[in-house]
Amino acid sequence: LKPITTEPVLTQPEGKLVTAAWYGKGFYPISGYSRIFSHEMEARATTYVNQGDTAIWIKNSLTEYEGEQGWIRISKVDNKGNWELRTPQAIMVRTNSKNEKKTFYVTKLGGSTPAAVNERGYTVGNNLNIRFRMDSKGVLSQVTTDGSEILGLTDGEGTWYPYGSYGYKYIANEDTPVKKPANLEVTKYVWANTINKQGSETIHTFVNVGYSGNDIYMSCPADTTLYFKGTILGNKVFFKSPQFMGVSKEYNRLLYFSGVRFAWDDNSPGGYKVSFVTGDIIFDYDATSHTLVLPKEYAIVAKVFGHDTYNIYASPSLRIYPFIEKAATPQAPQFWKPERNFRNYTYDERIQKGIAQVQFIISPHDVNGEYINPDSMYYRMYVDDPETPFTFDKIDYPALPKDEMTEIPFWFTDKEYIMGYTNTLRLLFFFTEVQDSIGFQSVYKGGGETRESNIAWYKLPKTTSIQGIHNSNNGSPAKVYYDLLGRRQEGLRKGINLIRKEDGSVEKVIQ
């Protein structure tokens, strides 16, 4: 290749940093380049540098590449709205196992269409430009969206590594986000939202609330790092709608607080219909209890900038009130779709263990239905014996915060063996032998006391036979090796090794 730039630009160029919603399509390899997946993104939060009449600089231009990427220049061509991304441009330097450095480039791919991705039917060339247009509203878009002009990842010899992106569009956002005063003290409030037409089902979450004179700052239920602002006037609180809360790192979106007129409607998608409000959303306010109540004809949504999508975080009958922690007895867990439990028991060659799964719901409510603090909740697992909680350890669960634990925090997940599908639904994989039944118990440590729920038991059907990891299981290895942190390894290595034997015992060996 004959690159336009030979070194990646890793320092942010000078110019105006613009927050934007980013659209695009692309593809990326998996399983050692044996397969290629395509993807499409809509309204992803990003930033770019605008240098006015000369250039725009974008970063992370290869949408699904996870390593650090340099800034890429899009140059202005004329005063008629034409811009172009000239390639090849250096985007990164990587060091291989031999400590050799290699420069990679973004290069226009030509000679094919996305249909040929799996055959890698693209060609790579020099001085190939990808065309862009800037409209009167400042929206920067790639001219072609069909994949005939693709930005790909190549090395200096022109070899294509199967990453590619196309259909770029950047929608600038000029709004200033609401900022909570730096020293403002906030307290925990309950956001209690009725979610069905009958008013019989309420979900709860926490938001942070702070007061500065007559101003009230409240965190977004979707992301408590973002805030919206209201003004207290007598027994009312006025919230401007819409107002920009900022970029949610959790969802990678630009979010707005918005009010909507809301009505249940069985003939509409989702069973309701909404219309967005421009102006003020007015809450009733009790200054004594510091409770806010939303009138029934309104709802609160988190609206995604640059897109039609939104999430409803308050349908009618929303109440927001201070949380006061007190001692409480939690509800017992519930097994979710128990017919699925244990049925996927297999011997996993990758981790060299027998493995089974169980799904259950742990609710942050006490036995009277009152919301309790999930940050103060834990659960225990029992195997056959109601007197002895199961001990989780780092050998089977390497991501545990402690070497051994009998109580798992409500929010803990390692995204592999202990997973949270929702705020309350848990999927847990385990590697121990179960003869008769398995149980779960909720524990709440609040108000200066520790209280436990009843144990919820799931009894294995008589037709189910769960063999534990102590069995050789069709010739599986009798010994499994770990390092001191509980990470699996192939055989003995220099240093301290842990060996789990076929009988379940663990031996420490120093090599």
Predicted segments with their positions:
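C-terminal tail/sorting-segment detector
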Residues: 498-511
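Predominantly extracellular/secreted and cell-surface proteins with exposed
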Residues: 41-124, 209-274
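Residue-level detector of functionally pivotal "anchor" positions at catalytic/ligand-binding pockets or at interdomain
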Residues: 328-342, 449-485
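Beta-strand-rich modules
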Residues: 430-448
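Solvent-exposed loop/turn segments flanking beta-strands in beta-repeat/beta-sandwich domains
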Residues: 352-405
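Edge beta-strand at a domain terminus
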Residues: 1-19, 39-43, 144-193, 201-205, ...
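Terminal processing/anchoring signals of secreted or surface-associated proteins
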Residues: 58, 218, 464-469, 485-487, ...
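Aromatic sugar-binding surface patches on proteins
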Residues: 274-276, 402-426
